[in-house]
Amino acid sequence: MLWTQLRRGLVVASLVTGGMVCAGWELAPVAAAEPGTPSWQGEYAGTLTDVSGRPQWTGLQVVAQGKGDYLGVELSGGLPGNRWNMRDRQEAVGRAEGTPTLVLASPVHKYEVDGWQVRVTDLRGKSVGTLQRYVRTSQTQGTPPPGTAIVLFAGGPTSELKNARITPEGLLQVGCETTRSYRDFCLHVEFKTPLMPEARGQARGNSGVYLQGRYEVQILDSFGLVSQNNDCGSLYKQRPPLLNMSFPPETWQTYEIDFRAARFDDQGQKTGPARLTVWHNGIKIHKNVELTGKTGAGAAEGPDPRPIKFQDHGDQVLYRNLWIVEK
């Protein structure tokens, strides 16, 4: 993963870590600077001194929760997908007080967030380090479709989607489905959840990709949360993701979904479950897992291929650059 450090809007450093492969595609998140003044919400990383005096790379996710409230999540080792040890997680809380700096407090640290960096002290007021702001971008964002792909949506009118509604900016709104039916495939999806800081749970930027109209890969603003089986990246109500790879809302994110349909014999009896592998922002979050049956409000399982749906759950989730390769 390559991610770019921001300091007052300037790129000042880059880091590179590993990549991964999905069905022949090279996948790895990459970061890019965005212009303008950032909010406090976002991702930060840097070296902090731990209680034993040793330096440790540390990540921090700052989550807007509405009405001036903020949640901070300190992650030992780094950000999700970038060296976090997937074990140690410390929460901090704070409230905007009308000053340029947001102050968060946890049982062990105080964090002063100015939107570009975070000054961290222990409970005695001693400095333990500074975290810099990073903006991460999935390296699969903007991936062009291969020659064998069917382009579902590329920014304009399309005959491959039914009930497609397109914004003046050329983005796809929720509530459409493919005109064709599909059996086994690899699917590329780019999506963006809205900023809804006061919303909670399933009311916070909800949509979903319904494979064959039967199995939902959930889309939700789950940034900074401990993933449950109905959060972003989950196989809805069946399995949470291995790792919460959600970026902040209003950030473009990607799914790569490698899907194999359930198998049935000539008598219509099920002989094998549907299986899939999912990458979220380039990181594998499900590896060849079995689906026990349809998810949520999905259509009943059967041998027939069916369309892919992009769920309308009432929130303004947006899509772009959708394409599929049949297997």
Model regions: which residues?
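Alpha-helical interaction segments
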Residues: L15, A33-P35, L242-M245
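Bacterial N-terminal signal peptides that target proteins for export
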Residues: M1-T17, A23
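Cleavable N-terminal signal peptides
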Residues: G19-V21, V30-A31
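Small side chains
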Residues: G18-G19, G46, G72, G94
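Short, solvent-exposed loop/hinge segments that bridge or flank secondary-structure elements
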Residues: L27-V30, P35-K67, E160-E169
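Carbohydrate-interacting regions of secretory-pathway proteins
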Residues: R54, V63-G68, V73-K327
